[in-house]
Amino acid sequence: MVKTKKNYSAPALEKGLDIIELLSESSDGFSQAEIAKELNRSVNEIYRMLNILVSRNYIEFDTNNERYKLSIKLLQLGFNSSTSKSV
């Protein structure tokens, strides 16, 4: 008997990861409208995701130019993971 892999959907998680991956493409960051356009999503939909990502410190909002950028949290998580593994 062949086992088939079940595909599960987690749209909110995918949206958040899409935002993180997009922000990784530019050191200048993106405005909320640019993120929505690039990801083919509504501005309201992106707004909610951005607020959560900022509150969890995965991304930062620059009030001077109103652009979102990645924070160093992902780097810190990767570093923590690599130091916790024994060689």
Regions found by a protein language model. Name each.
Residues 2-84:
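N-terminal helix-turn-helix
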